[in-house]
Regions:
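A short, charge-rich alpha-helical start-of-domain segment used by transcription regulators
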Residues: 6-30, 34, 43, 54
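Conserved catalytic core of Hanks-type protein kinase domains
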Residues: 23, 35, 52, 74-75, ...
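Arg/Lys-rich amphipathic alpha helix in sigma70-family domain 2
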Residues: 74-95
Length: 113
Protein backbone atom coordinates (compact mmCIF):
# COMPACT_ATOMS: atom_id res chain seq x y z
CA UNK A 1 0.00 0.00 0.00
CA UNK A 2 2.85 2.40 0.77
CA UNK A 3 4.33 2.01 -2.70
CA UNK A 4 0.93 2.65 -4.26
CA UNK A 5 0.53 5.81 -2.18
CA UNK A 6 3.72 7.14 -3.74
CA UNK A 7 1.92 7.06 -7.10
CA UNK A 8 -0.79 9.43 -5.84
CA UNK A 9 -0.08 13.16 -6.07
CA UNK A 10 -1.95 15.25 -3.52
CA UNK A 11 -2.56 14.67 0.20
CA UNK A 12 -6.31 14.73 -0.47
CA UNK A 13 -5.98 12.01 -3.12
CA UNK A 14 -3.77 9.99 -0.76
CA UNK A 15 -6.47 10.12 1.93
CA UNK A 16 -9.11 9.09 -0.59
CA UNK A 17 -6.90 6.25 -1.84
CA UNK A 18 -6.42 4.92 1.70
CA UNK A 19 -10.19 4.99 2.28
CA UNK A 20 -10.79 3.15 -1.01
CA UNK A 21 -8.15 0.58 -0.13
CA UNK A 22 -9.47 -0.05 3.36
CA UNK A 23 -13.15 -0.10 2.37
CA UNK A 24 -13.01 -2.10 -0.86
CA UNK A 25 -9.93 -4.32 -0.75
CA UNK A 26 -11.78 -7.40 0.51
CA UNK A 27 -14.69 -6.97 -1.89
CA UNK A 28 -12.22 -6.66 -4.76
CA UNK A 29 -10.38 -9.75 -3.52
CA UNK A 30 -13.64 -11.73 -3.47
CA UNK A 31 -14.41 -10.64 -7.03
CA UNK A 32 -10.94 -11.71 -8.18
CA UNK A 33 -11.07 -15.05 -6.33
CA UNK A 34 -14.44 -15.80 -7.95
CA UNK A 35 -12.82 -15.39 -11.37
CA UNK A 36 -9.38 -16.90 -10.77
CA UNK A 37 -10.12 -19.55 -8.11
CA UNK A 38 -6.65 -18.86 -6.74
CA UNK A 39 -6.02 -16.62 -3.74
CA UNK A 40 -2.47 -15.59 -4.69
CA UNK A 41 -3.45 -14.68 -8.25
CA UNK A 42 -6.48 -12.83 -6.90
CA UNK A 43 -4.21 -10.75 -4.66
CA UNK A 44 -2.14 -9.92 -7.75
CA UNK A 45 -5.29 -8.85 -9.59
CA UNK A 46 -6.33 -6.57 -6.73
CA UNK A 47 -2.84 -5.08 -6.64
CA UNK A 48 -3.00 -4.41 -10.40
CA UNK A 49 -6.43 -2.85 -9.97
CA UNK A 50 -5.15 -0.52 -7.27
CA UNK A 51 -2.24 0.48 -9.50
CA UNK A 52 -4.84 1.59 -12.06
CA UNK A 53 -6.76 3.44 -9.36
CA UNK A 54 -3.59 5.23 -8.25
CA UNK A 55 -2.76 6.21 -11.84
CA UNK A 56 -6.24 7.64 -12.42
CA UNK A 57 -7.24 9.08 -9.04
CA UNK A 58 -8.56 12.22 -10.73
CA UNK A 59 -11.26 10.06 -12.38
CA UNK A 60 -12.29 8.23 -9.20
CA UNK A 61 -15.39 9.48 -7.41
CA UNK A 62 -15.96 9.72 -3.69
CA UNK A 63 -15.51 6.44 -1.77
CA UNK A 64 -19.14 6.24 -0.65
CA UNK A 65 -20.57 6.62 -4.18
CA UNK A 66 -22.09 3.57 -5.85
CA UNK A 67 -20.36 4.52 -9.12
CA UNK A 68 -16.99 4.31 -7.35
CA UNK A 69 -17.77 0.84 -6.05
CA UNK A 70 -18.83 -0.27 -9.55
CA UNK A 71 -15.64 1.22 -11.02
CA UNK A 72 -13.46 -0.68 -8.55
CA UNK A 73 -15.30 -3.94 -9.23
CA UNK A 74 -14.97 -3.42 -12.99
CA UNK A 75 -11.24 -2.77 -12.97
CA UNK A 76 -10.75 -5.73 -10.63
CA UNK A 77 -12.65 -7.99 -13.04
CA UNK A 78 -10.53 -6.75 -15.94
CA UNK A 79 -7.30 -7.30 -14.00
CA UNK A 80 -8.39 -10.81 -13.00
CA UNK A 81 -9.40 -11.70 -16.56
CA UNK A 82 -6.04 -10.44 -17.85
CA UNK A 83 -4.23 -12.65 -15.33
CA UNK A 84 -6.47 -15.59 -16.24
CA UNK A 85 -5.65 -15.16 -19.94
CA UNK A 86 -1.90 -14.80 -19.29
CA UNK A 87 -1.93 -17.93 -17.15
CA UNK A 88 -3.82 -19.92 -19.80
CA UNK A 89 -1.45 -18.77 -22.57
CA UNK A 90 1.52 -19.82 -20.46
CA UNK A 91 -0.03 -23.19 -19.65
CA UNK A 92 -0.85 -23.87 -23.30
CA UNK A 93 2.76 -23.09 -24.26
CA UNK A 94 4.00 -25.49 -21.58
CA UNK A 95 1.69 -28.21 -22.87
CA UNK A 96 2.85 -27.61 -26.42
CA UNK A 97 6.51 -27.83 -25.38
CA UNK A 98 5.79 -31.04 -23.46
CA UNK A 99 4.22 -32.58 -26.57
CA UNK A 100 7.27 -31.98 -28.75
CA UNK A 101 9.31 -35.09 -29.53
CA UNK A 102 12.60 -35.39 -27.72
CA UNK A 103 14.83 -35.87 -30.71
CA UNK A 104 18.44 -35.00 -31.18
CA UNK A 105 17.83 -33.44 -34.57
CA UNK A 106 20.12 -30.60 -35.42
CA UNK A 107 18.41 -27.42 -36.51
CA UNK A 108 20.29 -24.99 -38.70
CA UNK A 109 19.21 -21.41 -39.04
CA UNK A 110 20.38 -19.52 -42.07
CA UNK A 111 20.21 -15.77 -41.72
CA UNK A 112 19.07 -13.84 -44.78
CA UNK A 113 21.93 -12.22 -46.63
Amino acid sequence: RVILLMMVDTPEEKRKFVILYENYRYLMLKVAVDILRDYQLAEDAVQEAFVQVAKHMENVGQPEETATKRYLITITKHAAIDIYRRRNRLQSREIYMDELPEGKEQVTYMAPE
